[in-house]
Amino acid sequence: MNFNQLIDHTYLKPEATKKNIDNLIMQGFEHNFFSVCVNSIWVKYVKEKIKKLNSNLKITAVVGFPLGASITQAKAHEAKLAVEHGADEIDMVIAVGFLKQKDYEYVLNDIKSVKKAIGNKVLKIIIETALLTKEEIKKATEIVLKSGAEFIKTSTGFSYRGASLDDVVTMKSVIKDQKLEIKAAGGISTLEDMQKMHEAGATRFGLSKSVEILKNQKVETKY
């Protein structure tokens, strides 16, 4: 299977420079990845670069990243600006602590506010599975199903672990045949990992070492 069009090619390090972002864009372009995923500060720059390449490469921007602890209005405004600057998709982080304290209404409204701010653009919801129990992952999936978002996403890549096969299986057990896709991200180090997660229900992947993984090279992760 060709995974290239299922990949959001990612560079989210705080020390990112134009050189890093230029490299990300060129790899995305040359390997026909679905999108490049960047922090919102880079969206306008990336949009200009992609336009010059006359490419269909999409732009994903992260919001409330990586902690999810920004107030709702800040998340919504950041998402709105990212879309105005050229983002096609938004990956936002939930208010993880509010989920854990069972303030489910806050978590749902937080997501809905961002969705309202971006209209018909695709919204992916990062629940940071590393910080959740299996039951909390199930509850988060139920909330995202009600929110109008298009995707649920495992991880930021900034916690103590990234996506696991078990995370994907747990999410899919709640989603079943309902209209919500799964993005697996963070710590994916082999093509075999991707294949197993895809079989379990993941339809998008967030990778920073996309090129190496598709060459079937095992890559080092920080986990």
Swiss-Prot record:
Protein function: Catalyzes a reversible aldol reaction between acetaldehyde and D-glyceraldehyde 3-phosphate to generate 2-deoxy-D-ribose 5-phosphate.
Listed GO MF terms: deoxyribose-phosphate aldolase activity
NCBIfam families attached to this UniProt entry: deoC (TIGR00126)
Keyword annotations: Cytoplasm, Lyase, Schiff base
Pathway terms, separated by semicolons: Carbohydrate degradation; 2-deoxy-D-ribose 1-phosphate degradation; D-glyceraldehyde 3-phosphate and acetaldehyde from 2-deoxy-alpha-D-ribose 1-phosphate: step 2/2
Principal subcellular localization: cytoplasm
InterPro entries (UniProt xref): Aldolase_TIM, DeoC, DeoC/FbaB/LacD_aldolase, DeoC_typeI
Protein name: Deoxyribose-phosphate aldolase
Record organism: Mycoplasmopsis synoviae (strain 53)
Reactions listed under catalytic activity: 2-deoxy-D-ribose 5-phosphate = D-glyceraldehyde 3-phosphate + acetaldehyde
Active-site residues, as the UniProt record annotates them: 91, 153, 183
Domain of life according to the entry: Bacteria
Family annotation (PANTHER family): DEOXYRIBOSE-PHOSPHATE ALDOLASE
Record's GO cellular component terms: cytoplasm
Catalytic activity, EC: 4.1.2.4
Family: Belongs to the DeoC/FbaB aldolase family. DeoC type 1 subfamily.
Lineage of origin: Bacteria, Bacillati, Mycoplasmatota, Mycoplasmoidales, Metamycoplasmataceae
